[in-house]
C-alpha cells in the first residue's frame, strides 16, 4: 500500500 508520503 502506498499512502504514507501523501499523508505525511
UniProtKB/Swiss-Prot annotation:
Enzyme class: oxidoreductase
Catalytic activity, EC: 1.11.1.7
Protein name: Peroxidase 4
BP GO annotations: hydrogen peroxide catabolic process
Keywords: Calcium, Cell wall, Heme, Hydrogen peroxide, Iron, Metal-binding, Oxidoreductase, Peroxidase, Secreted
Organism per entry: Cycas revoluta (Sago palm)
Essential cofactor(s): Ca(2+); heme b
Biological classification of the source: Eukaryota, Viridiplantae, Streptophyta, Embryophyta, Tracheophyta
Bilayer-crossing regions: none
Function: Removal of H(2)O(2), oxidation of toxic reductants, biosynthesis and degradation of lignin, suberization, auxin catabolism, response to environmental stresses such as wounding, pathogen attack and oxidative stress. These functions might be dependent on each isozyme/isoform in each plant tissue.
GO cellular component, one term: extracellular region
Catalytic activity: 2 a phenolic donor + H2O2 = 2 a phenolic radical donor + 2 H2O
Entry GO MF terms: lactoperoxidase activity; metal ion binding
Subcellular location: Secreted; Secreted, Cell wall
Family: Belongs to the peroxidase family. Classical plant (class III) peroxidase subfamily.
Cofactor note: Binds 2 calcium ions per subunit.
Amino acid at each position: 500500500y502506498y499512502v504514507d508520503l501523501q499523508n505525511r
